[in-house]
């Protein structure tokens, strides 16, 4: 059996705020979708990011509620440690909450963490040395 990660599903309490965060992060999600119940963004070289409102999730599963706590994190790689700092600063300046300031980790990456509008931790990282 072959298996491939196809879609990362993200439930949004407020679609406009959630899409705004990921646009600020750098994903070119088209404008004009902030009031949709479901938005699929096909990343250029990875899985689809499927955004679904909490109301739409309740239509599929009537008892659905956004969970408390962190059950996963999203990790976005940029090209350099400076880009980690720049993107982190941009997100904080746009009013998003910091989870941890950028730092160099012993495993060879610079990373910073912010929270999206629904409290999910989003990691921004780059390798400290040149590698893919």
Q: What spans do the regions from the language model cover?
A:
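Vicinal oxygen chelate
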Residues: 1-7, 27-115, 126-132
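Conserved active-site tyrosine of GNAT-family acetyltransferases
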Residues: 18-23, 91, 116-119
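Short, conserved beta-strand/loop elements in beta-sheet-dominated catalytic cores
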Residues: 120-124
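N-terminal functional modules and adjacent low-complexity/disordered segments of proteins
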Residues: 6, 14, 20-22
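Conserved beta-strand-loop-alpha-helix junction that forms the acyl-donor binding cleft
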Residues: 12-14, 106-107
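A generic structural signal for alpha-helix starts
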Residues: 13-16, 82
